[in-house]
Amino acid sequence: MALKELLVQLDETDEAVLRLQLAVDLALSHASRLTALFVDEWNIAQIDQRPSPELSDGSHTASRILRDDLERFHTERGLEFEWHYMREFAGPAVRQAALYADLCILCDQGSSNCADVDRAFCSDIAVNVGTPILFIPKSTRLSSVGRRIVIAWDSSRAATRALTDAIPLIEESDHTIILNVDTGTHAQSTAGLQRLTERLSRHGTHAEYLQIERVDGRSIGNLLQTRATSLGADLMVAGAYGHARVTEKLFGGVTRDLLEKMQIPLLVSH
């Protein structure tokens, strides 16, 4: 599937500037239209209050600067874009806008100052949005996404879905590494990993696979993150496991670790 409609979530944080730059680069690389959704999010403490002028002024200033950046990208680089400003909670706003996108580019947390809301944002979006989600960690300082990709692979339906959704990005990458953690109980065959490598190579990327052992009781999510970082990856692709009604119970394993402790951009599908 070609990526022709991209959605990027923006807000008044400093990280939104880099998120927009990465989204613009992806849109231009794939000849896509970019929809910029600026969410001026309600704070939990303000639900029963009118927003302060200071907060509104800050959000409006940030949105104006980002809108001006988009206009500049349109003039200088030919970017096709749409702009939407919403005073809303991030979750509902993103879920609605995602209905019309091929890929959503989001921050790794909601804009709320409430830690529980931040943690719930990623899992809620990953489970309830059928569109592939590219989370950009607030801590990232990468200047590009998708040149060197790591695929978190366990032969599951979720991993297969995520890999397939990432094909347009894989086709533009320089190097793709299939990373498999050998847990001893569901070991992946070398032949299967080699076959998958051949599949990806047909999409024009330099592909290889790497198996790592689970040692010292470390979580699989931690192992994947650590190895991906050491390999110089600028994107990890992983399946999202869970069910909308019992997200908190089922996001207790690899998916939760990847979502809550993101070190590099993460593409997930459910």
Predicted regions and their residues:
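A short, aliphatic-rich alpha-helical micro-motif
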Residues: 98-99, 126, 170, 230, ...
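Structural beta-alpha unit
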Residues: 1, 72-104, 203-236, 240-247, ...
